[in-house]
């Protein structure tokens, strides 16, 4: 997953979720809504697997410092299948000479946005999910930042749902739901 933002920061997005289940070949479990029926042929021998690391949270800001995004998580791979790391959550910008709002970062699922510090008519946008694009989608967008007076930031996106938007008073959005296999 992606790292979260600091100082009214948005939540980090979940890493991309990929799943395959073909009822005639895949066993007796219930697949999530994200499953596809595309098989991957494997031959005996080594299969390259990389487990991507989670992203670091954004750095704490000094007085007058610029905002930073949480770091995007690293890509995970199994053979030829890749799942993107989650997008980083955004942070409020405490530099008075700069805009005080940041958008969430894109990724497997998008990072949530910081609250709307730029005044009426502007909204910090949650980061895009399913980046890079695959079908079915590997994740969803992060939530938008809340209104100026609310200090509510967006939740990070999940495997099966978007993160919810921040709202007033001081309500941070909930992260998007994950996927369940049974």
Predicted regions and their residues:
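Glycine-biased low-complexity/repetitive sequence motifs
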Residues: 1-182
């Amino acid at each position: 997953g992606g790292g979260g933002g600091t100082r009214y920061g948005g939540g980090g997005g979940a890493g991309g979720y990929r799943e395959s289940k073909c009822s005639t070949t895949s066993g007796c479990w219930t697949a999530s809504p994200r499953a596809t029926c595309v098989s991957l042929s494997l031959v005996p021998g080594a299969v390259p697997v990389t487990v991507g690391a989670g992203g670091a949270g954004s750095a704490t800001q000094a007085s007058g410092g610029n905002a930073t995004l949480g770091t995007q998580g690293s890509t995970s791979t199994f053979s030829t299948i890749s799942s993107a790391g989650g997008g980083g959550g955004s942070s409020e910008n405490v530099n008075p000479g700069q805009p005080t709002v940041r958008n969430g970062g894109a990724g497997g699922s998008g990072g949530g946005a910081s609250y709307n510090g730029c005044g009426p008519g502007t909204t910090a946008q949650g980061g895009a999910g399913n980046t890079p694009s695959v079908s079915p989608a590997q994740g969803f967008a992060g939530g938008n930042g809340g209104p100026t007076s609310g200090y509510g930031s967006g939740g990070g996106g999940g495997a099966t749902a978007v993160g919810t938007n921040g709202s007033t008073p001081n309500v941070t959005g909930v992260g998007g739901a994950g996927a369940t296999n049974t």
